Amino acid sequence: MTPEEVVRAELEAWASLDADKIMAYIADHATFLPGFSFPTYSGFKEIRKAMEGFVKVMTKCDIEIVNLAVVGNVVLTERVDRLIFDGKPVDAPGMGAFEVSGDKITAWRDYFYSAADT
């Protein structure tokens, strides 16, 4: 898979709200910075625990890719993440930076607009 295909598959997996599918493209040694006030998670087990926590309080997750750019193994996404999170609808516009090695994401950093900016 190309880096773009890996990232697209990862983002599509979120619609399932299935932690196994979401984690299928995450490397054992990956780092994940989900934005907002969340900490950086490091390593497969720590990231999986975070993902399980996120999907536990979601009843919907649709991710619209507005723009996507690839430079080598880095994929940049402009997105709108549309969620029902803790019973509340949320449209979260933002950017993501993904570093990909082979068919795994080794680093994922998200940057979202604050509510005051949207």
For the regions a protein language model found, what residue spans apply to each?
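A beta-strand edge to alpha-helix "cap/lid" segment located at domain peripheries
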Residues: 2, 48-118
